[in-house]
């Protein structure tokens, strides 16, 4: 009987370990993919009109931003700490960009992680900088520390 009990414990432990291992492996699978995409960020309504002749309601003109790739693909961007910059700073919508993004399964929306300007064969990381407080921010606004002005900063990315 004693050996029977030990065999049962060994089987249960193996089953639990296998289940825990499968559960752990499931958690390790990424919830998103990281990608790098190039193009220009534009208003979705403007891109749909220009590319497909689709008109939007007037109140939707500046409602959604998308990354338009050179091949004409439109990728909508999440409006969050990074994505808000495209709504607030028109200069960003005039630049050739490379965006490092997260793509989540089941949604076309992309979350911007980093943004780079492509100019004259070089790549520059973009953010906002307060010269007084020496802090980085990710959208155009007053400095979070001193409430003073901040500037768009371009930092050369070395190959």
Task: Say what each PLM segment does.
Residues 1-9:
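Bacterial N-terminal signal peptides that target proteins for export
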Residues 53-78:
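OB-fold (S1/OB) nucleic-acid-binding surfaces
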Residues 81-98:
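Short nucleic-acid-contacting surface segments enriched for D/E, G, S/T with interspersed K/R
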Residues 20-34:
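Transition segments tied to proteolytic processing and entry into folded domains
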Residues 102-108:
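Short, charged beta-turn/beta-strand-edge "cap" motif at the junction between a beta-strand
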Residues 30-61:
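Structural detector for short beta-strands of small beta-barrel domains
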Residues 112-159:
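Cys/His-clustered metal-coordination modules, chiefly Zn-binding fingers
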Residues 8-17:
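Bacterial N-terminal signal peptides
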């Amino acid at each position: 009987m004693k050996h029977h009990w030990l065999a049962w414990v060994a089987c249960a432990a193996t089953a639990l370990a296998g289940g825990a291992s499968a559960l752990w492996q499931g958690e390790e699978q990424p919830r998103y993919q990281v990608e790098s995409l190039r193009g220009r960020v534009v208003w979705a309504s403007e891109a749909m009109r220009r590319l497909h002749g689709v008109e939007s309601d007037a109140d939707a003109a500046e409602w959604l931003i998308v990354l338009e790739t050179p091949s004409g693909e439109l990728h909508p961007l999440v409006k969050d700490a990074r994505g808000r910059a495209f709504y607030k700073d028109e200069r960003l919508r005039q630049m050739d960009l490379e965006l490092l993004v997260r793509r989540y399964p089941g949604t076309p929306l992309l979350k911007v992680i980093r943004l780079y300007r492509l100019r004259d064969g070089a790549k520059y990381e973009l953010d906002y900088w307060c010269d007084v407080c020496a802090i980085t921010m990710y959208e155009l606004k007053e400095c979070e520390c001193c409430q003073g002005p901040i500037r768009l900063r371009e930092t050369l990315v070395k190959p």
